[in-house]
Amino acid sequence: RKGKHQAELYADCLKQMHGQRPIIFYPNGFESYIWDDLFYIDREVQGFYTKDELKRLIDRRATRQDLRTFKVNTSIVERQYAWEAIQRGAEHFVTDNPKGALRGKARKSLLVMATGTGKTRISAAIVDMLTKSNWAKRVLFLADRNALVTQAKNAFTQHLPHLSSIDLTKEKEDNGTRLVFSTYPTIMNKIDGMK
């Protein structure tokens, strides 16, 4: 990608001058990318981050914990196969670089499970892991029906009462909320309304 190498050179100079590696943004003429080269590979973004968001990303470098060593809350998920699913997800997200430092390996993961096997509880346990390990600040939970949104919000509120939550199908948006629940059409309308 054009611009990436030049942005990396600027980041090297800024690190020398200020003693801290910056978060890198670079365009290629059509798209813009963000790159925390100490942790994740680059990815496309739609705009720039605020000063507070950049500070949080830099702070996470020191406070982010290894997901592979997280102890799953057994009051949320009680079954061995659920623990195994969460552990495999954690291993999918994390790797070590050649020097042994923690690195992000993937930003997405997929669990496919049959009806009645505890998808909502496993999701709550994964959110618990990601928030307590300082990998996620906010979480968006999407469902195809209002009833499933309500059910998920109630389950998350029961198992993760320390995280604020909102159902966008019924409540007004609040930027400080940690857990956001919505249907696909509701969130698409919110996105379209921002354009």
Predicted regions and their residues:
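ATP-dependent helicase/translocase motor core
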Residues: R1-R138, A143, A147-L163, N175-L179, ...
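Short, solvent-exposed loop/turn elements at beta->coil junctions and helix N-caps
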Residues: L168-K172
